[in-house]
């Protein structure tokens, strides 16, 4: 439902090989970082099948390199394989949670679980995401490989999950947080114990989704 899941530098030698020498991919010895970097190049060009191959090779090269799993998780989401997306994100998180781009993983998990209709898991990962994001010290998270995806999208997933779980008070709070963080003066105060109030919350969710998709 979203426009879903920084380093895209590729060494000159690898880049020239890929551009000018057919079928040379198997004749070079690339590091896991170079393999993952080129996977991101393919990802940013919307070539997700190729991206999957490069991230897969990077994982085979080094099973402990976090950005390979990150790339694979986001790529599988674009290939409509949300269960595989969850697998790669969670597989690495089971090994390590101390790396710098961890918010990418929890954002990706939030989107993937939402796509699977697992609202409780989606909300849990949203909560972990916001628990680890420090807006005082750092600007709000945005996905470095698609700057249109940011922490407001994660907040929307949280609000949608809360609505589906009938946590309407929490949903309203999340909606208001999105408006506040977006610089809007809108304040939602619905009687969510009524059908009309819940319907109005759903309308706000749809409006915010459209605004974020078109921002």
Language model features with spans:
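Terminal, low-structured helical/coil segments at or just beyond the last alpha-helical repeat
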Residues: 148-215
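Start-of-helix register in tetratricopeptide repeats
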Residues: 33, 67, 74, 101-104, ...
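Register position in tetratricopeptide repeats
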Residues: 44-45, 78-79, 112-115, 164
């Amino acid at each position: 439902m979203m426009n879903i899941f920084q380093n895209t530098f590729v060494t000159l030698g690898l880049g020239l090989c890929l551009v000018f020498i057919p079928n040379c991919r198997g004749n070079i010895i690339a590091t896991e970082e170079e393999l993952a970097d080129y996977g991101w190049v393919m990802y940013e060009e919307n070539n997700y099948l190729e991206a999957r191959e490069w991230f897969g090779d990077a994982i085979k090269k080094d099973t402990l390199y976090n950005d390979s799993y990150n790339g694979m998780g986001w790529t599988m989401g674009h290939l409509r394989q949300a269960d595989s997306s969850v697998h790669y994100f969670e597989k690495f998180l089971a090994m390590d949670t101390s790396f710098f781009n961890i918010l990418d993983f929890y954002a990706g998990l939030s989107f993937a679980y939402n796509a699977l209709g697992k609202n409780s898991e989606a909300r849990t990962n949203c909560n972990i995401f916001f628990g680890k994001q420090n807006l005082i010290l750092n600007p709000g998270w945005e996905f470095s490989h698609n700057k249109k995806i940011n922490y407001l999208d994660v907040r929307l997933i949280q609000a949608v999950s809360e609505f589906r779980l009938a946590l309407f008070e929490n949903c309203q709070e999340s909606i208001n947080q999105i408006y506040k963080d977006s610089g809007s003066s809108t304040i939602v105060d619905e009687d969510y114990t009524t059908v009309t109030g819940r319907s109005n919350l759903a309308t706000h969710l749809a409006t915010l989704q459209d605004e974020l998709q078109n921002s």
